[in-house]
Amino acid sequence: HTNGNDPMPNTEYSTWGFWAMGAVDVSPNSGNQTAAVHLGTWVAGELLANNNIPTSGSANMSGAAVVKAAYRHNSSDNTYDVHKYTTTADVAATFNWGSSAYTGTLAFTNFDDKNPIVVNAGFTSFNVSLNSSNGLTSRYTGASTTTIQNGWSGGAAVEGALYKSTYPDESGGRINVSLYKNGPLNGQGANDFYVAEGIYLVD
């Protein structure tokens, strides 16, 4: 968008980066089974101790996401035409602490807002509802609650963690987004898809 997305935050208890790999044979099957990753993303941090998770109140954080996206748009039959690139989004987080568990929301905005599929599906901004895993633990999961438009299916999911050993000061994790349509192979655009996988970090 016009002003660009927020940068990844400069955090004290967590960090992130890119990684790459290539292999000429990744399978025991006959023949060469090549594989490669370019600009994969990772995030890691000092996990919050479970006994230091607050049992009341709330916290707000903000930051950004970096994802690797791939999509196929308005193609038919056996036309491959898959485009791949790296893109970003702004992220705002709210955590609501409870006595036996916590909930929250991740709000993603300006998410790949030039992609025709994401725009048509109304998914340039979406919310993910968070729930702590197995009670009061530093890890949580979430799924998107935003309605997808114009016949698209799919959504977003996250797996994240709270960072800083003594108090939840930062949070990060992985996100995946999937948008798709089903139809006959020879139908124009009927088998379009969009996938994105990456990370987010907030403080």
Which residues make up each language-model segment?
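Mature soluble binding/inhibitory domains
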Residues: H1-D203
